[in-house]
Amino acid sequence: MSSGRLLLLLGLLTLWAELTPVSGLGRPKFCELPAVSGFCKAYIPSFYYNPDASACQKFIYGGCGGNANKFKTIEECHRTCVG
């Protein structure tokens, strides 16, 4: 195979790897939990992973209760649930 074809094949494989969605196999189970504001009245902007949108989204946390799918920053949410 010529070097031009190998380079084209490598480029196509790289593109495919970048565009193929990552499966949730390595994602913690709590990332699948819904956003829960909790039962207190605080106003704490937070982030959760929305599996339907495959993205981290903002929500308001009340300060107590809730579940593990709650992050202080969108970066923390991405590191944990998106990969």
UniProtKB/Swiss-Prot annotation:
Residues annotated as domain BPTI/Kunitz inhibitor: 31-81
Subcellular location: Secreted
MF terms (GO), sorted A to Z: serine-type endopeptidase inhibitor activity
Main location: secreted
Site feature (Reactive bond for trypsin) residues: K41, A42
Pfam families for this protein: Kunitz_BPTI
Alphabetical keyword list: Disulfide bond, Protease inhibitor, Secreted, Serine protease inhibitor, Signal
Family indicated by similarity: Belongs to the venom Kunitz-type family.
Protein name (database record): Kunitz-type serine protease inhibitor TCI
Originating species: Ophiophagus hannah
Classification lineage: Eukaryota, Metazoa, Chordata, Craniata, Vertebrata
